[in-house]
Swiss-Prot record:
Claim: Iron is one of the keywords in the record: no
Name of this chain's protein: Callatostatin-4
Predominant subcellular localization, coarse grouping: secreted
Record's keyword annotation contains Endoplasmic reticulum: no
Leucine amide, modified sites: 8
Record-level GO cellular component terms: extracellular region
Tissues expressing this chain: Brain, subesophageal ganglion, retrocerebral complex, thoracico-abdominal ganglion, peripheral neurosecretory system and intestine.
Sorted UniProt keywords: Amidation, Neuropeptide, Secreted
UniProt GO BP: neuropeptide signaling pathway
Function according to Swiss-Prot or TrEMBL: May act as a neurotransmitter or neuromodulator and play a role in the integration of information within the brain. May be involved in the control of visceral muscles due to its ability to behave as potent inhibitors of peristaltic movements. May also fulfill a neurohormonal role on muscles of the gut and heart.
Similarity-based family: Belongs to the allatostatin family.
Taxonomic placement: Eukaryota, Metazoa, Ecdysozoa, Arthropoda, Hexapoda
Compartment list: Secreted
Length: 8
């Protein structure tokens, strides 16, 4: 979802 999606 977020461009920096690391699982947050």
């Amino acid at each position: 979802d977020r461009p920096y999606s690391f699982g947050l």
